[in-house]
Amino acid sequence: MFPKKIKACILFLLLTVPAALGAVWCAKHAYRYHLAVHPLPYSPEQGALLEKHRQDKRNARLNPHAPVLFLGSSTMEFWLKEGKHSWETWFSPLGCLNLGTRSETTGNLLWRLNDGLTSPLAPRINVLYSGVNNLGVQKSLGWTAFQGNVAIVKKIREIYSPETTAIIVIPPLIAQKGSRMETFRNCLLQHDFGENVHVLPLHFFLPGKDASLYTWDGLHLNALGYEAISPPLFRFLQQLLSRSSF
């Protein structure tokens, strides 16, 4: 039998340690939520990304009449690399402008929008793929990445009204069953973002359980992955662009 003092200590630990761990968990995810829904500038260690942001602003000034603007993380940027053939086949003829940036979180994109990324532009459609890096880089919850998308859509709506500009939100293309990524995807699919905002489930065009067929690392699309999702996205863009007004 344990002495009474040891029993008391054990009881104290059993009562207080879970509460303390719970408080730490809550504080950690509250901070990650803050990073997701508020503008997050690039750090001094992210000089290459800051230079990419400056180049994107220059590209925006050079293409002020682009009818479709692609925003988001590496899946967007790599459309011009691994998916180059698909981009040149389907989206270059439409005059689309791609300002996607690798490693970008929702907070980073909010900061870029605040910093005038889209100031010279008046696109009829914004295509958004953001939040994956919140889960990967910041280890956030799926719900947190979803709230980051809500904040981005709200910010875009401050810049462009629903009467002039549509928004397409693309949920995560690759998500394992039961993962935080799947939670993120489901949150986007179930949410009503409001007037003229469309959630487009392009992951349905990547059938099968073997992600390696469509990716080169289990997350980022390869050429085949981009070839699979480009035609349905192109058709939806055409459908929206054919409307005389929204």
Question: What is each model feature region?
Answer:
Residues 97-99, 136-142, 175-177, 215-220:
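Second-shell loop/turn segments in exported
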Residues 71-73, 130, 200:
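Active-site flanking residues adjacent to catalytic metal/cofactor-binding acidic residues
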Residues 1-71, 75-82, 234, 240-241, ...:
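N-terminal secretory targeting modules
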Residues 54-69, 110-119, 155-157:
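Short amphipathic alpha-helices and their capping/turn segments at secondary-structure boundaries
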Residues 93-105:
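A short beta-strand-loop structural module common to alpha/beta enzyme folds
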Residues 69-71, 97, 126:
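Conserved beta-strand elements of the Class I
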Residues 77-92, 107-150, 155, 166-175:
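Oxyanion-hole/transition-state-stabilizing segment in secreted/luminal serine hydrolases
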Residues 173-246:
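Catalytic His-Asp segment of secreted/periplasmic serine-dependent ester chemistry enzymes
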